[in-house]
């Protein structure tokens, strides 16, 4: 009996993890740059992080001009929400995700308006 339960448990876990893997592949990454760029930067960001907003405002334009637009670098943005507001904003960012980073820049540019709730 223990052997049957163990086998069923292993089958169940294997089935559940394969379903999860298929779902995670359907998430379209927000990125900019050529797919075949030699360098890919993966940026883990929280949409309520002031440092991340500063990166999008002050560093990213130069990075885009000097490296991304020339096809040398590709940047991929991944959500790493640090609070519930960032989590909800990341869901908004994925809702109408065309794979481009415009929504990220819009959310970061208006971060001071939406990230802090009234207490």
Predicted regions and their residues:
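Positively charged n-region of N-terminal signal peptides that target proteins for export
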Residues: 1-4
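Bacterial N-terminal signal peptides
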Residues: 7-16
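Bacterial Sec-dependent signal peptides at the C-terminal "C-region" and cleavage site
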Residues: 15-23
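A short beta-strand-turn-helix
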Residues: 23-39
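Short pre-active-site segment immediately N-terminal to redox-active cysteine/selenocysteine motifs
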Residues: 40, 45-48
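Structural alpha/beta surface segment adjacent to cysteine/selenocysteine redox centers
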Residues: 45, 53-119
